[in-house]
Amino acid sequence: MAAAPRACKGHGRPLPVLLLLLLLALPPLGGPPGAAAYFPEERWSPESPLQAPRVLIALLARNAAHALPATLGALERLRHPRERTALWVATDHNADNTSAVLREWLVAVKGLYHSVEWRPSEEPRSYPDEEGPKHWSDSRYEHVMKLRQAALKSARDMWADYILFVDADNLILNPDTLTLLIAENKTVVAPMLDSRAAYSNFWCGMTSQGYYKRTPAYIPIRKRERRGCFAVPMVHSTFLIDLRKAASRNLAFYPPHPDYTWSFDDIIVFAFSCKQAEVQMYVCNKEVYGFLPVPLRSHSTLQDEAESFMHVQLEVMVKHPPSEPSRFISVPTKTPDKMGFDEVFMINLKRRQDRRERMLRALEEQEIACRLVEAVDGKAMNTSQVEALGIQMLPGYRDPYHGRPLTKGELGCFLSHYNIWKEVVDRGLQKSLVFEDDLRFEIFFKRRLMNLMQDVEREGLDWDLIYVGRKRMQVEHPEKAVPRVRNLVEADYSYWTLAYVISLQGARKLLAARPLSKMLPVDEFLPVMFDKHPVSEYKAHFSPRDLRAFSVEPLLIYPTHYTGDDGYVSDTETSVVWNNEHVKTDWDRAKSQKMREQQALSREAKNSDVLQSPLDSAARDEL
């Protein structure tokens, strides 16, 4: 009997047929297992992902019309599905139009979010036991605690997974903040918010009576020298509660716990509630999440509060994009002015568009009108152009830190200021304000400078130049305070020309010195002209040296960056030698001394005799 032919020998094709059947039974390439099968009844669809958690955002606002456009705009940009987000908003005791702003926004967005609960109260406009709108009386504390408790109850009643509390002046600029906090899987967790000073929305220590306690752990966390999520005794202002956690059922804002004996303060009452429920609070500083203002004193005004929040927006722009307002709110039109000066100049290199845009926005926020002056780009000047202007370096000049001659960048900087002095004289401008473009403003800048100039005029002070921002180089003894004028001292040897006020008389004196024929950096030239430069050889080339120079104290302007900071760029120090474009001067920026932060002054050298204004104390950091 003949044997059947073997398939492997090619006699017949049973193997390919079997392979084909097997391939048909397999799911499509890249498809999930079981998504396809030989028999229709064996096919099934993959499971869909989980829906985003349900979140209720609770916002309490009082006298916050100035902050709400930016705060609400930031909330709109949170990357969490709006259909899974509910809004709970309350406002009362307002002396401004907070209710109208919130109503306009809620009407516009109510169809975008899962639900909206709106709790306005138009009357009364103040608490009976408060001394002013910034004073926290017992009745105000109690009312806020009741509102937070009501928001918490609403979240529980709607079976929300989380509740996010946000103060009306807190800017959550990181759109992933909510997602990142949820991922931490903590019962109570806060994003660390930045401010202009050491203040933030957490404590690292608490006394036995429930008050704030300084600890060595605070500053490393606040400065992000240590990064992570840290167990702390207190978080406030902006924080997330995970309502899925069993322990969250024992948390309450009001009434205070039966064992509570500490100060009647809403944040301390809630911290005690967490402690009694054995719920640990956490603060996370892994990323930059947002910003908040430093609290003002109880006697501060609504104007102080509005300007304080505006300063938060200015601080944001130093290293981040500006905080844009909600597109659903009508923002009041700004009316810039020149602060009483004949002209406000802002110097900017054309190729530094980022600085120009930031400074123009910062001035607009403060309602300061300026004239943009295109800076002289020293790096773009060739030797023949320098010679055509009759420029010669001061004989014997060497940079005090590197021993190098003048750079093209320093030459361009000098010419930029020189051209402004010429314009001041040509136009007969009695007093002008000059800004460079790499500066940051102190809080209440506009009001404090205007008050200072009013004092100067009232006293009839004979002045030529007033530093608004500088680096004080003479640190052995204090500078002389000006009698009867607040916040002003006679300037000693100083660096930097970040911002200054110049008079017509002062500009004439600077031009009369014919500085182009014996040039040195502009911030070395000015101390020579008011006879405070420590190098007598430099001073010998200029006479008279009778510039009447003063300085604001405390300063109202500081640099945006110092040597070694991320983003530090120098257009003056990193350049080429003034008369030879082939000799580079790109020094090690990390070792540059000129742009280092002002060194700490000894107690004996501080300008402690200067007359202070009320705004100075309001501007101090609470910590």
Curated annotation (Swiss-Prot):
Annotated glycan sites: 97, 185, 382
Catalysed reactions listed for this entry: (5R)-5-hydroxy-L-lysyl-[collagen] + UDP-alpha-D-galactose = (5R)-5-O-(beta-D-galactosyl)-5-hydroxy-L-lysyl-[collagen] + UDP + H(+)
Location of the motif Prevents secretion from ER: 620-623
Signal peptide: 1-30
Cellular component terms (Gene Ontology): endoplasmic reticulum lumen
Any single GO BP term: positive regulation of collagen fibril organization
Keyword Chaperone on entry: no
The protein's name in its UniProt record: Procollagen galactosyltransferase 1
Species, as recorded: Bos taurus (Bovine)
Taxonomic lineage: Eukaryota, Metazoa, Chordata, Craniata, Vertebrata
UniProt gene name: COLGALT1
